[in-house]
């Protein structure tokens, strides 16, 4: 989009100006920066644009960008004038975002529609397709002008409830005869308790929001003493089982767990131990775990009497803590990353919802909601707003 590309170029120029140091000799790069600044100043200085202010009123925004004389040494006054001039330009661009963002669009747009915004874009006259915030580049991705960027993400795991109740043979009211799972997974963390009320391994899956790779940590937590099991396929008015559990992590060994990393249903890697693992590109982690077995039963406590028959008084239990330390994936509208925070902060200050004369209804005013949480009829509108704010968030 032309406004986003203009913001990108002005952000880049601001960074170059900030990299200059006053009262020192200016070399070729510094001279180029001053020339680029002067080119914009000669076109924009003194011009007035009627755009939306922070209370959504049309107000005159005047650009104050005096031309800087070319010299071998940049004075402190000239450096401060350049910095203030670019800030004046950012005031206009922020108002342009509020103005253009208030206009609804039903498809991906590449050109500003508001006449005053288009006038400002043409007067500034510089553009750059690339932003340091990958969310600002998503409209370029949508129009096939750019590939998705590979970046660290904050929420590789899909939010899911990991509940299972599988009876086998005889059962009792303390969890005997059941294979059960009770757990949750979201963001980078999953915590799952495995109750093994009869022989046999238990398998469960952790699904990724998007295919990713990174570093994974698995460790054991103290298991609860009593836990209410899910009803599984039983009628909702059934009385749930309260499993009486014994933490058997003291005898848990490498052979008791198998971790498989899957991509599109195909196993691409595996491991059979706890600890820290570098996992390959995958969209699912499948874990098979067996807290207790026949060999361990040979010297079992009396609480585990008749465990093979499913009628033990207490059940072997393990609580597994899964933590994805870091993960990288192609940035998409639904992925969360560190780049959301700064833009969302601006949505509470410079770009509050009240500063837009019209905003998408039934949408929480955060970057995540604008990018992926809007109704289908508003999604292109909300993404336009989000991408513009994301580009602006890269300014110093």
UniProtKB/Swiss-Prot annotation:
Q: Which UniProt keywords apply?
A: Capsid protein, Intermediate capsid protein, Virion
Would you say which domain of life the source belongs to? Viruses
Where is it mostly found?
virion
A single Gene Ontology MF term assigned here is: host cell surface receptor binding
- What is a biological process (GO) this protein takes part in? fusion of virus membrane with host plasma membrane
Q: Name one GO cellular component term.
A: viral envelope
**Where found, per UniProt?**
Virion
Q: What does this protein do?
A: Intermediate capsid protein that self assembles to form an icosahedral capsid with a T=13 symmetry, which consists of 230 trimers of VP6, with channels at each of its five-fold vertices. This capsid constitutes the middle concentric layer of the viral mature particle. The innermost VP2 capsid and the intermediate VP6 capsid remain intact following cell entry to protect the dsRNA from degradation and to prevent unfavorable antiviral responses in the host cell during all the replication cycle of the virus.
The entry sums up its family as follows: Belongs to the rotavirus VP6 family.
Quaternary state and partners of this protein?
Answer: Homotrimer. Interacts with the inner capsid protein VP2. Interacts with the outer capsid glycoprotein VP7.
Its name, as the record gives it, is Intermediate capsid protein VP6
Origin organism is: Rotavirus X (strain RVX/Human/China/NADRV-J19/1997/GXP[X])
């Amino acid at each position: 989009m032309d406004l986003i590309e203009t913001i990108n170029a002005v952000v880049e120029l601001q960074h170059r100006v900030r990299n200059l140091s006053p009262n020192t000799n200016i070399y070729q790069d510094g001279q180029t920066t001053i020339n680029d600044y002067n080119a914009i100043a000669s076109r924009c200085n003194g011009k007035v644009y009627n755009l939306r202010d922070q209370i959504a009123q049309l107000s005159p925004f005047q650009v104050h960008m005096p031309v800087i004389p070319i010299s071998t040494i940049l004075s402190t006054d000239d450096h401060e004038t350049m910095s203030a001039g670019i800030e004046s330009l950012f005031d206009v661009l922020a108002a342009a975002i509020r103005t253009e963002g208030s206009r609804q669009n039903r498809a991906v747009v590449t050109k500003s529609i508001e006449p005053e915004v288009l006038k400002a874009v043409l007067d500034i006259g510089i553009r750059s397709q690339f932003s340091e915030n990958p969310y600002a580049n998503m409209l370029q991705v949508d129009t096939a002008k750019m590939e998705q960027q590979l970046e660290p993400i904050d929420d590789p795991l899909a939010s899911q409830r990991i509940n299972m109740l599988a009876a086998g043979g005889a059962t009792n009211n303390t969890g005997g005869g059941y294979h059960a799972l009770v757990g949750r997974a979201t963001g980078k963390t999953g915590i799952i308790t495995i109750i093994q009320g009869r022989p046999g391994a238990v398998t469960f899956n952790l699904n990724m929001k998007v295919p990713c790779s990174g570093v994974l940590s698995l460790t054991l937590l103290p298991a609860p003493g009593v836990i209410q099991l899910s009803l599984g396929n039983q009628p909702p008015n059934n009385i749930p089982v309260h499993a009486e559990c014994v933490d058997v992590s003291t005898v848990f060994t490498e052979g008791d767990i198998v971790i498989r990393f899957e991509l599109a249903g195909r196993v691409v890697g595996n491991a059979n131990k706890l600890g820290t693992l570098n996992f390959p590109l995958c969209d699912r982690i499948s874990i098979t775990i067996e807290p207790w077995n026949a060999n361990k039963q040979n010297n079992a406590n009396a609480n585990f009497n008749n465990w093979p028959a499913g009628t033990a008084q207490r059940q072997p239990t393990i609580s597994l803590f899964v933590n994805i330390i870091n993960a990288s994936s192609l940035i998409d509208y639904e992925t969360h990353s560190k780049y959301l925070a700064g833009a969302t902060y601006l949505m509470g200050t410079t770009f509050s919802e009240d500063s837009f004369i019209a905003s998408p209804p039934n949408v929480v005013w955060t970057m995540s909601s604008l990018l992926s949480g809007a109704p289908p009829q508003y999604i292109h509108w909300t993404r336009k707003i989000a991408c513009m704010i994301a580009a602006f968030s890269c300014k110093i």
